[in-house]
Amino acid sequence: YTTKYYGSDIPDSQSFDKQAERASDFLDTITFERLVDGLPDNERAQTKIKKAVCAVSDKLYGLELAEKQALSAAAGSDSKTDINGKSSGIIVSRNSGSESISYASPSEIANGAKAWSAVYSAAGDEQATNKLLYDTANVYLMGVRDNEGTPLLFAGL
């Protein structure tokens, strides 16, 4: 993973196996199941597919960490609560005299996430996550063909 396909984000083999399985499922989806029965015979195509799995695995691992960090930050940060005691916002400032509390707006929260990285901004947003993963895989899979000569990313019949 790290030496042959230059993966770098996943610290252990158990975590890699989990993310690689999820990445393979994602590649099966975007290649319209063309890889379910195995890789193409062409060795260069096989290498590109394996690199795509590793790159998507890295992104999936980063997304998982970002979501865990967001949940942890939300649980540990000050937030406003509604009538039922459920959290409904993040407190960004608080004054004591004559009590004044300011809450982060959704756009402020989103802008902060976008500033971190594409992975953090995609975390929790299914459409952004899918685009990030597709763009990551596309770099490796563009032009790669199956044994019948059909491009893996071709959506036609």
Question: Locations of the language-model features?
Answer:
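Divalent metal-cofactor coordination and adjacent catalytic microenvironments
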Residues: 2-157
